[in-house]
Amino acid sequence: MRTFLLVQLDSEGAPYSEIAELLEDAGFRPHDGGYDFVYDWGRAPSVRESLDLADRVQATLKGKSVYFRLESADE
């Protein structure tokens, strides 16, 4: 399973390069297509693990003026 991440930046917030570095440090990789980043679980995560990942993304982006959307899919 993979979790896709779409980010929306504010012009008054952190630069995209900083956001990308933070997300890559959190285990996400840049993604070509309709999403900006992808997290590859390598297996089906539990609901708790999915919620923990969302919490980590929120904590990582806190104070950076970034909105985000997560979506998981089997692929």
For each predicted feature, which ranges?
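Long, contiguous binding/interaction regions
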Residues: M1-F4, D10-E75
